[in-house]
Amino acid sequence: MLMNSIYSFTLQELKKELTKNNIKAFVAEQIFDWIYSKHVDSFDEMKNISKENIEKLKQLFSFENMVVDKLQVDKHDGTVKFLLKLEDGNFIETVIMKFNYGYSVCVTSQIGCNMACKFCASGLIRKKRNITVGEFIKQFIIAKEYVEKNFNDKLTHMVVMGIGEPFDNFENLIQFFEVIKQQKGLCISPRKITVSTCGLVEKIKEFADLKNQVNLAILLHAPNNEIRNKIMPINKVYSLDKVIEAMDYYIKVTKRRVTIEYILIKDVNDSDENAVELAKLLKGKLCYVNLIPYNKVVENNYFRSVRGKQFFDVLKKNNIQATIRLERGSSIDAACGQLRIKKILELRNAKV
């Protein structure tokens, strides 16, 4: 029998599940305390739960078997990148970053990615499967424990911008948000969470209707369809005008500002004309642009732009709010998915 992960339930859902199996509802609060405050990953360690109930719990629920295969720490800014091995032998990446407001974690939503953005390492290997709710939560717990142990601090923020397209794993993603905000659990405010999408229009609208206060970032990366078609194949399904229309719907429904992510790629999308066109596209909208320095991926022929400041100045001149993202993880495999690809190639070569 395939058991449900203990990490996949909200407190109320777990209470109902326990009651259904003749275990008192209050045991759910004890379990939450053990797994989210004391960080145990075995029912046998839960000393205030009866042996009879522990045996029942072992038959009903599983713990995520996720281990750190490799750890990289940037020598300049302290960014931490984990390569995590999952129970089925797959690998994912999770990253801890330090900001002036505290520590944030970037989690992975899929094993591989089908969006196939031409500049991205994540899409070099196609999607194998979605990350489960339990695997989402376990990534956060591993990062949380690391921050508490090594930095004597708290992990307070999260972005779902790792490997994969989060909105292509919509059901698990939304349940993850419900679980992580539980007050007697990890208690992460939705306002401290940001999720990104490359532009799955129907899901942007569905996400808007939830009004769950999680922040939205749209990976635009181009000011027109011609450029976006070349670097983001998804644009041939969801064209730029449809993505902007979905963003407008999100803003209207939620009254929340959207982040526009824009990776600057040399001689592709970084000219003054591109900046002017982007400014016209976003004029009057409740959004701001996050300009991102490109991390080179050896498997493709794209390069980092040196025109970040000029591009920023053009946006500013045209009354578009923008920032240039501070580069992090420069001394490690910074590009999303790079560490995973290295591991996969290493394993393939070992078999030859």
UniProtKB/Swiss-Prot annotation:
The enzyme's E.C. designation: 2.1.1.192
CC cofactor: [4Fe-4S] cluster
Disulphide bond pairs: 106-336
UniProt GO BP: rRNA base methylation; tRNA methylation
SUPFAM superfamilies associated with the record: Radical SAM enzymes (SSF102114)
One of the Pfam families matching this protein, by short name: Radical_SAM
UniProt entry keywords in alphabetical sequence: 4Fe-4S, Cytoplasm, Disulfide bond, Iron, Iron-sulfur, Metal-binding, Methyltransferase, rRNA processing, S-adenosyl-L-methionine, Transferase, tRNA processing
One of the record's GO molecular function terms: tRNA (adenine(37)-C2)-methyltransferase activity
Reactions listed under catalytic activity: adenosine(2503) in 23S rRNA + 2 reduced [2Fe-2S]-[ferredoxin] + 2 S-adenosyl-L-methionine = 2-methyladenosine(2503) in 23S rRNA + 5'-deoxyadenosine + L-methionine + 2 oxidized [2Fe-2S]-[ferredoxin] + S-adenosyl-L-homocysteine; adenosine(37) in tRNA + 2 reduced [2Fe-2S]-[ferredoxin] + 2 S-adenosyl-L-methionine = 2-methyladenosine(37) in tRNA + 5'-deoxyadenosine + L-methionine + 2 oxidized [2Fe-2S]-[ferredoxin] + S-adenosyl-L-homocysteine
Residues annotated as the enzyme's active site: 93, 336
Binding site for S-adenosyl-L-methionine: 164-165, 196, 295
Signal peptide: none
Note: Reaction proceeds by a ping-pong mechanism involving intermediate methylation of a conserved cysteine residue.
PANTHER family on file: 23S RRNA METHYLTRANSFERASE, RADICAL SAM CORE DOMAIN-CONTAINING PROTEIN
Function, in words: Specifically methylates position 2 of adenine 2503 in 23S rRNA and position 2 of adenine 37 in tRNAs.
Protein name: Probable dual-specificity RNA methyltransferase RlmN
Organism: Malacoplasma penetrans (strain HF-2)
